[in-house]
């Protein structure tokens, strides 16, 4: 299962509302090959993502060329008036129903990754949801499983120990309040787990404005955002970008046209520790 090709950067679709389909089309046409969404109508138009993907599938782009990732969002994260599954059903059935809704919304027969949007109220409930996701994995409905919004290393370690299908992805907000998940990122790297970052730019205006980043941006004729994204990708992190700007889409994909030197990466790393 974990042999799935790792995307280098992912287009995120939260909060796009009725612009979702058009933005997904633009992202794919500019070159994004990984899309993140969620079965959570409160913040995502998952069906719009599916329609956008379908519009891009052609003789030159197959479903297999795309990495499609969605999430099971627990009841606590749903709009009670728009929950995409029966909130009164047993938890395992909620996961199954949400997954079926996602396949329908995304017009696909499988997911590249199914992510638990957040840990549940306690470890027992989280394990129950994970077992339901493992059943989906067993049936080849999801090629990988992951967890998001998991900032407690001990919690992640316990899930990893107990899981029969190990987490292949951890997707967390990348910000100073959690120390940029230093320990979690080490844990992931040691176990071949892909660490995905979100809010990478939004939560870090101080990094983007720092003179170290500004100097690197000037040296490489890039933007501060490109410097931060490139640093992270060279560290093995897969960033999400939810930009609505086509110019920024192009810039985000252009980060792989240059590389930071080792001493430059150390300088940026020092900023994350300060």
Kindly give the residue locations of the regions a language model identified.
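Active-site groove signature of glycoside hydrolases
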Residues: 104-123
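Short, acidic/polar
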Residues: 16-28, 88-105, 153-157, 180
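Hydrophobic residues within beta-strands of alpha/beta enzymes
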Residues: 35, 111-114, 145, 170
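Structural motif corresponding to the early beta-alpha repeats
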Residues: 64-92, 117
């Amino acid at each position: 299962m974990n042999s799935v090709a790792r995307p280098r950067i992912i287009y995120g679709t939260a909060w796009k509302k009725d612009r979702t389909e058009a933005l997904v089309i633009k992202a794919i046409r500019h070159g994004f090959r990984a899309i993140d969404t969620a079965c959570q109508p409160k913040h995502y138009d998952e069906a719009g993502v599916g329609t956008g993907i379908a519009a891009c599938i052609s003789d030159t782009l197959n479903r297999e060329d795309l990495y499609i990732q969605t999430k099971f969002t627990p009841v606590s994260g749903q709009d009670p008036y728009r929950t995409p599954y029966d909130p009164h059903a047993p938890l395992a059935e909620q996961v199954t129903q949400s997954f079926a809704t996602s396949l329908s919304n995304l017009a696909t027969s499988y997911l590249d990754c199914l992510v638990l949007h957040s840990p549940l109220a306690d470890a027992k409930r989280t394990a129950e949801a994970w077992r339901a996701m493992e059943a989906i994995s067993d049936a080849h409905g999801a090629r990988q499983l992951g967890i998001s919004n998991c900032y407690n290393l001990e919690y992640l370690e316990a899930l990893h120990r107990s899981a029969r299908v190990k987490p292949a992805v951890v997707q967390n907000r990348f910000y100073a309040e959690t120390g940029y998940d230093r320990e979690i990122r080490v844990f992931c790297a040691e176990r071949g787990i892909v660490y995905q970052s979100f809010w990478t730019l939004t939560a870090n205006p101080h990094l983007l404005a720092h003179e170290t980043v500004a100097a690197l941006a000037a040296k490489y004729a890039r933007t501060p955002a490109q410097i931060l994204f490139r640093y992270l990708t060279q560290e093995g992190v897969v960033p999400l970008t939810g930009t609505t700007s086509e110019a920024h889409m192009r810039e985000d994909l252009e980060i792989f046209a240059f590389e930071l030197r080792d001493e430059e990466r150390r300088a940026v790393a020092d900023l994350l520790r300060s």
